[in-house]
């Protein structure tokens, strides 16, 4: 479950960057790019919330603490209604959006590696007992 949601978020982040790169190189129009990105934003937020709750319920406190800043950031964007990409502003904010998505992608990759590490550590610890 943990690895699946982390890889879903990773694929989602890569999808966002590909859409923005396609827009930058004029392979896609702004409306299509914004609608593609906006269609996966809320599922990304839901997956992050479920993952954080899953870590909390299973007693993985360290991973819960690592997921909380990203969850807070997503909640903050959603509450200020800044979570969706605006079609009319997408060209003006293209570099900022790409930087934001790259930072989120790096954060997700770090969480993925830590999740894999803790799964292997837990499996080896159970094997020794």
Curated annotation (Swiss-Prot):
Top-level division of the source organism's lineage: Eukaryota
Record GO cellular component, one term: membrane
GO BP annotations listed: vesicle-mediated transport
Annotated TM spans: 45-65, 105-125
Membrane topology: Multi-pass membrane protein
Pfam families in UniProt: Cornichon (PF03311)
Record keywords, A-Z: Membrane, Transmembrane, Transmembrane helix
Record localization: Membrane
Keyword RNA-binding listed: no
Matches recorded under PANTHER family: CORNICHON-RELATED
Family to which this protein belongs: Belongs to the cornichon family.
Record protein name field: Probable protein cornichon homolog 2
Lineage, broadest ranks: Eukaryota, Viridiplantae, Streptophyta, Embryophyta, Tracheophyta
């Amino acid at each position: 479950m943990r690895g699946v949601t982390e890889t879903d978020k990773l694929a989602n982040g890569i999808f966002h960057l590909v859409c923005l790169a396609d827009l930058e190189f004029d392979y896609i129009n702004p409306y299509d790019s914004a609608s593609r990105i906006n269609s996966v934003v809320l599922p990304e937020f839901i997956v992050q919330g479920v993952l954080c709750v899953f870590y909390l319920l299973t007693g993985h406190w360290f991973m819960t603490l690592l997921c909380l800043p990203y969850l807070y950031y997503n909640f903050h964007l959603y509450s200020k209604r800044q979570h969706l990409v605006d079609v009319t502003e997408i060209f003006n904010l293209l570099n900022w959006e790409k930087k934001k998505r790259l930072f989120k992608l790096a954060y997700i990759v770090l969480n993925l590696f830590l999740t894999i590490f803790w799964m292997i550590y837990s499996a080896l610890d159970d094997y020794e007992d």
